[in-house]
Amino acid sequence: MLRLLLLPLFLFTLSMCMGQTFQYSRGWTNGKRSFNAASPLLANGHLHRGSELGLTDLYDLQDWSSDRRLERCLSQLQRSLIARNCVPGSDFNANRVDPDPENSVHPRLSNINGENVLYSSANIPNRHRQSNELLEELSAAGGASAEPNVFGKH
């Protein structure tokens, strides 16, 4: 009696182990089996040929089209940026006369901030004067008391 019960149980266990080994030998994991549940139907029952034929990739068509759109958009953006930067009139320093062309290799690079209004060395006293004028206006208006030491440090 025990032999009749153990024999089917042993055969069932053996068949399950063989089936599991077959699935893992074909590269199936739990995530792949649950994600591609319809792939055996598309492969006409040939479970191992689905990945060889590329039929599992049919589910990624929407991803491919969106990837293509993103790549196309990126290439158009790159082309527009390159075209904008390569316009002949975009170099604002090209028409400027160099004061000492023989002393420096690239005079434009020696004074990068010379043409920038905020960071030019010529405007530093003006900025200090403007901050002092603001301090005087604040103290004359009787607003919030600002310490002169704070403005003097800048």
Swiss-Prot record:
GO terms for biological process: acetaldehyde metabolic process; behavioral response to ethanol; cellular response to ethanol; courtship behavior; neuropeptide signaling pathway; positive regulation of heart contraction. InterPro entries: Procorazonin. GO terms for cellular component: extracellular region; extracellular space. Residues 70-154 form a propeptide. Pfam families: Corazonin (PF17308). Keywords: Amidation, Cleavage on pair of basic residues, Neuropeptide, Pyrrolidone carboxylic acid, Secreted, Signal. The modification Pyrrolidone carboxylic acid is found at Q20. The modification Asparagine amide is found at N30. Expression is restricted to 24 neurons in the larval CNS (8 in the brain and 16 in the ventral nerve cord) and 12-16 neurons in the pars lateralis of the adult brain. Residues 1-19 form the signal peptide. It comes from the Eukaryota. GO terms for molecular function: corazonin receptor binding; neuropeptide hormone activity. Cardioactive peptide. Corazonin is probably involved in the physiological regulation of the heart beat. Clock (Clk) and cycle (cyc) proteins negatively regulate Crz transcription in a cell-specific manner. Belongs to the corazonin family. This is Pro-corazonin. It comes from Drosophila simulans.
